[in-house]
Design a protein with these regions (language model features):
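Surface-exposed binding/hinge segments that line
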Residues: 60, 105-166
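Short, solvent-exposed secondary-structure boundary motifs
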Residues: 44-52, 100-109, 166
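N-terminal lobe/hinge region of extracytoplasmic solute-binding protein
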Residues: 2-63, 70, 92
Length: 166
């Protein structure tokens, strides 16, 4: 993909390549506004703080350590199908980072958590010892398409790393 400048219709200067989000909000958590408005998660929280389905249409605990999610039959905005393999890709990518959540490590999945795509729509996550915050953590695990991971990602061009940049 070639980067192309986005021009101001009034004849102003280019604002940057088309795959760059130019942010003028000085807040250190401005990335929340971007990710929560451009990506989906397995679940969401409604205005009353109650967990609601997102890309996972349902979930259940099989035992105290195993969470099973049934993923929606869905398609990304770029036309790529969403399925259990895409969920696993997102999980694997985030688990590569030491501390993917800038607000705090309490949002990270433990290193011994495993994720298995059982079939096209089923995910099984195993939490050795259990994790009462698992559903909250899923709310913060963004599930972009492969195009995002392959072309854009969360990599900071200054550091060459995605560590803590979402």
């Amino acid at each position: 993909m070639d980067a192309q400048a986005t021009w101001d219709p009034g004849g102003g200067q280019p604002w940057g390549p088309h795959n760059t989000v130019t942010v003028v909000d000085p807040s250190p958590v401005n990335w929340l506004s971007i990710t929560w408005n451009t990506m989906e998660e397995a679940n969401r929280v409604d205005h009353d703080g109650i967990g609601q389905p997102g890309l996972a249409e349902s979930w259940r605990w099989l035992d105290k350590e195993t969470l099973e999610l049934t993923m929606r039959d869905a398609v990304y905005q770029d036309g790529e199908p969403f399925n259990a393999a895409m969920f696993k890709l997102g999980f694997d990518k985030v688990q590569e980072w030491t501390n993917p959540h800038p607000p705090g490590a309490f949002l990270n999945f433990a290193r011994d958590v495993t994720c298995e795509a059982v079939d096209e729509r089923t995910i099984r996550m195993r939490f050795p010892g259990g994790d009462s915050a698992a559903l909250m953590k899923l709310r913060g695990m963004h599930l972009p398409s492969t195009r995002f991971w392959n072309e854009w990602g969360f990599v900071d061009p200054k550091t060459g790393s995605a560590e803590g940049h979402w």
